[in-house]
Amino acid sequence: MFIEVEKFVEARTNSIAQLLKAIDNDALVSGEVTKGPRTAAQRLPRHMRRRAMAYDIRRFPRTMREFAAAHLISKHAKKCPSRFARRKSANSRTKFGRSTSTKGIWLSTHVWHAKRFRMIQKWGFKLADRSFQRGFRAVLRDSNKNCVIRDRSYYTCVTIQCTDAYSKISQFSQKGCRGQSSRDEEEECHQLYMPGKYPFGYIGPARFQRLSGDKVHIWIHPSSKLQFMKALLEYYNLEKQENTEEDLYKNSEIKVSIDAENICRFHLSGPKCLSKLRDSIRFVNDEKFSSEHNYFLSVSDSVFQSSRDGEVINLLIEDPRTTWDRKTVLKHKKVNKEADNERIRVSKFWNKEFREMAIEKRMADSEFHKQNSSKINGVISTEAKVPIILIIRNEGLKALDGADILIPEPFAKDFWVSLQRRGVRASGLRDEYAAHLESKALYYPLDDVGSEAGRESELAMKKELIEKYLGKPHNRRCKHWSAVSVKYPFEFKWDELSQDWNLSNKPRSEAFVCRDLQKLRIIEEAMKKGSGLEEFQEPGMLIPVKLQFFGRGRPKKYGMVCLPTDDDLISIRKNRNREIIQTPPEASSQDSDIVEAMEIEEITVKKNQGFMSLEAAASEKPINLKLLFEETTKLDDKTTKRKRVNRKKRESKKRRKIEQEKRKEEAEVEEVQKLATKYRFSANREIIGRLVAGEQSVLAGHGVGIGYICANTLSLIASNYHKSKTVVMVRNSTSKYYHPAYVTILKNATKI
């Protein structure tokens, strides 16, 4: 089909005229072909245009900025946030409410910690383990010179109400295992046992606070909560009450309630903890609490060690958010120590209605920040008046002494942030464990060996270490038995060790820890004298001790405490850094003959070894003919290569099978040798105990360890080095070197 060009152009004359008019438009900038500029930048010549004009109004000429501003606002308006961002806060609150014991319950400071700490699941909670920053030494330094805070809100508060509640709950406690007795409302630490099973049936430590004759508050570690509640319910025949907001158990006489969510507990440690706390709170002007406030101010200005351990101070403060401003310096009046004589105790914290009223009056965060920004000095006071309890912790444990703070849960995070803005350093579980070791105190439940919680933590640690050990290649694993002669590298086996040292005719008994403080003091005096220890040689009794290395050495957990020989003591006096090496276990006579024959065969020297032959044929080597001719096909090369690879695979498989069978035989031989060897004599020095914790002390500059030794061995080591000093040999489970260390009885009770 053909068309006539003249008729086609005549029919479209008007369209062509409009196109030419648009192209030749004098109003447009030179070079533009569009009708009317679409943006402000297109009104400029090409040499004046910049890509940044779409974002920065200052790129336009001054005469065009007012016109271009409207284009930029409409084009770059803030877009709507994503669906995830819009629902982030609501999802966080929902997730906080959904957190259960299976995934780990969140504490009130969880979000703050999760941004700064590595979180782990422990005892049914999500807890902060260690900081992302490298502040391990800084935390220890501040715990001795400044102030450190730890969140211990995972402790469980159990309230017991009945007539003479303190005497009834004392059925689970042993008087000789605790320190000083409390006065009035003071808090004290008890060691809980199953009724009628002492010295066995240890449950764990707990803190008691009695308000009156009919009410006692007990703070207990979550790892021992189930065992304690089970024993309490069975002993008093308590029944759980249904349709109640909190866990409630009672009978005709006793009422037991568990409050694990409404109260938070913080621990401040360090010499400046009271002064930091004073600068972080704003007191409510209430006459009822004026004497308590004055007493706290007098204590905060005085020497911290002058306060009594367990002393309770009740305070009423404003909303902690009112002290968030770092520039605001709170000025409190100075009060003398004589305020103690006029002190009137007022306690509103344990009044549930008073706490709930403060929670209801708490101002929302959005409203608080709105009012705080509109006022010159910020918000100074709100309707919410927060009751808190301050508990002095003066136990003589260096890095652990300080104060505990009890505060209602909705105000806990605000109070935490207020302390952070005053320079208080936060720490996690690893730092707390290190602080216990620096203070030479047992850390419950990881260092405890007599309770169910301690045994469970030991099994969990054993499982973790075995998985890590089996994950290494065979040639990178430590040969604990054949190389360093360690029978149990990942466990303690206290029952077996105590039985090996049971030299009397008394019946076999399970291992238990001596926690009687008076008995431990008598044992320490007897060790200094070197006599009178025979009466304490009970079968199965373990004595907690602390070890101080005075030479080289860095003790570790699962280290062995051994009995030194006379030669060891002589060599230590000459050179305390001399290394005593552990020899591997002796093999049987048949095995030794084989080893000797193999050594003779390997040492056999050839006739002409070391001489060069002068014969020409001696230096000749066979040459492969295939390498001389290039006529070999590629197919032959591929076939040869494939055969070579397959041959290597078969050889490697055969070699692995032989090595696997060899390792299996060696493991069976080792098991037979272990069964035939007593735990006590498994090393070339008699084992008398094990280490449950140990590390190089940052503050002292030498190795420090904590462990247990059998009571039957005390007479063998008493004052063996000096009139008042006892020395033992310590060896780690992965080392072959023995190191000397002073041993001292640990007289501090296990505390939380």
Curated annotation (Swiss-Prot):
It catalyses: Endonucleolytic cleavage of RNA, removing 5'-extranucleotides from tRNA precursor. The keyword RNA-binding applies. The gene is popl-1. It comes from Caenorhabditis elegans. Component of ribonuclease P, a ribonucleoprotein complex that generates mature tRNA molecules by cleaving their 5'-ends. Also a component of the MRP ribonuclease complex, which cleaves pre-rRNA sequences. It is found in: Nucleus, Nucleolus. GO terms for biological process: tRNA 5'-leader removal; tRNA processing. Component of nuclear RNase P and RNase MRP ribonucleoproteins. Several subunits of RNase P are also part of the RNase MRP complex. This is Ribonucleases P/MRP protein subunit popl-1. InterPro entries: Pop1, POP1_C, Pop1_N, POPLD_dom. It is an enzyme of class 3 (hydrolase). PANTHER family: RIBONUCLEASES P/MRP PROTEIN SUBUNIT POP1 (PTHR22731), RIBONUCLEASES P_MRP PROTEIN SUBUNIT POP1 (PTHR22731:SF3). GO terms for molecular function: hydrolase activity; RNA binding. Keywords: Hydrolase, Nucleus, RNA-binding, tRNA processing.
